[in-house]
Curated annotation (Swiss-Prot):
Enzyme class: hydrolase
Gene3D superfamilies: DD-peptidase/beta-lactamase superfamily (3.40.710.10)
Key words, A-Z: Antibiotic resistance, Hydrolase, Plasmid, Signal
EC annotation from Swiss-Prot or TrEMBL: 3.5.2.6
The name this protein goes by in its record: Beta-lactamase OXA-48
Keyword Signal: yes
Keyword Signal: yes
Gene Ontology CC terms, in alphabetical order: plasma membrane
Record function comment: Class D beta-lactamase which confers resistance to the beta-lactam antibiotics, including amoxicillin, and moderate resistance to cephalosporins and carbapenems such as cephalothin and imipenem; in the DH10B strain of E.coli. Acts via hydrolysis of the beta-lactam ring. Has oxacillin-, cephalothin- and imipenem-hydrolyzing activities.
Length: 265
């Protein structure tokens, strides 16, 4: 059984706005070394589902809200499925023929591949078909971040008013994992399938990356969870990312923390 082997002396604090089930969060500043090593700043938040405990390296930043960027593909997918904008994970979305800088976008996709390759144009079309009224209603039902969809309906998560913190990401993900969001269990199951990132004999990771570039500060995200035989660990990390050169650090730093705490080998 994997137990969190926290190697530092913890500061226990109650923080308003963190997941309602969490009365005490523990801070481990030793995790900061993983950011310092890569000359960056950021936060990692972990949640032990069995013990109902939260851990982070930076309590203040854990509660600071940023644009969700492409992590918003998780709620966008759920809403599109539940409203029938997307029939299922097999429906094909035809490439519009416009050549874009990211080569993997320049082809047909289904929900699984659109999530995997973070295909913005596909998700913008989802949002346009969902519309402002239904999008706003669903995000309120999800209690997703500040629920503010001001800006364009097909880009508010990239350059509009919506903001979400790492701890709020954890709250949302926990509801998704337990099929407790206000959409069908089928919709939640399909999205969790689309989030599959890594699977081996030790663990399964379901997650989504994000990279906010249109509004300063530019932020990189990785949010999701680690499924073990006897527990689930939720995670949400964001970090300063002035250029795209460090995109791989989102996963690398998170995994360094998970390994430090002996959650993954």
């Amino acid at each position: 059984m994997r137990v969190l082997a926290l190697s530092a002396v913890f500061l226990v604090a109650s923080i308003i706005g963190m997941p309602a089930v969490a009365k005490e969060w523990q801070e481990n500043k030793s995790w900061n070394a993983h950011f310092t090593e890569h000359k960056s700043q950021g936060v990692v938040v972990l949640w032990n589902e069995n013990k109902q405990q939260g851990f982070t390296n930076n309590l203040k930043r854990a509660n600071q809200a940023f644009l969700p960027a492409s992590t918003f593909k998780i709620p966008n997918s759920l809403i599109a499925l539940d409203l029938g904008v997307v029939k299922d994970e097999h429906q094909v979305f035809k490439w519009d023929g416009q050549t874009r800088d990211i080569a993997t976008w320049n082809r047909d996709h289904n929900l699984i591949t659109a999530m995997k390759y973070s295909v913005v144009p596909v998700y913008q079309e989802f949002a346009r078909q969902i519309g402002e009224a239904r999008m706003s209603k669903m995000l309120h039902a999800f209690d997703y971040g500040n629920e503010d969809i001001s800006g364009n309906v097909d880009s508010f998560w990239l350059d509009g008013g919506i903001r979400i913190s790492a701890t709020e990401q954890i709250s949302f993900l926990r509801k998704l994992y337990h099929n407790k969001l206000h959409v069908s269990e089928r919709s939640q199951r399909i999205v969790k399938q689309a989030m599959l990132t890594e699977a081996n004999g030790d663990y399964i990771i379901r997650a989504k990356t994000g990279y906010s570039t249109r509004i300063e500060p530019k932020i990189g995200w990785w949010v999701g969870w680690v499924e073990l035989d006897d527990n689930v660990w939720f995670f949400a990390m964001n970090m300063d990312m002035p250029t795209s050169d460090g995109l791989g650090l989102r996963q690398a730093i998170t995994k360094e923390v998970l390994k430090q705490e002996k959650i993954i080998p």
